[in-house]
Amino acid sequence: MKQGIHPKYDLVTASCSCGNVIKINSTVGHDLNLDVCGECHPFYTGKQRDVATGGRVDRFNKRFSVPGTTKA
């Protein structure tokens, strides 16, 4: 392999807004500030909300549905 073509890996500290600090090897070269991490992200903590916003299909079905019929 050629010498000197590979990036230099440094020890970087990634700090989350929740206070979690993660030390990783990265080519970025400076410390990182994260908005969310695995400790505070709603998907991983189980505090996930179901956002049921009607889209174009729901609007179409509401506009062109036949009154008096029910969905099976």
UniProtKB/Swiss-Prot annotation:
Necessary cofactors: Zn(2+)
Role description: Binds the 23S rRNA.
GO molecular function: metal ion binding; rRNA binding; structural constituent of ribosome
Quaternary organization: Part of the 50S ribosomal subunit.
Entry's cofactor comment: Binds 1 zinc ion per subunit.
Domain of life: Bacteria
Family: Belongs to the bacterial ribosomal protein bL31 family. Type A subfamily.
Keywords, in A-Z order: Metal-binding, Ribonucleoprotein, Ribosomal protein, RNA-binding, rRNA-binding, Zinc
Residues at which Zn(2+) binds: C16, C18, C37, C40
Signal peptide extent: none
Coiled coil: none
Pfam families linked to this entry: Ribosomal_L31
GO cellular component terms, A-Z: ribonucleoprotein complex; ribosome
HAMAP family according to UniProt: Ribosomal_bL31_1
Record's keyword annotation contains rRNA-binding: yes
Name of the molecule in the record: Large ribosomal subunit protein bL31
Gene Ontology terms describing biological process: translation
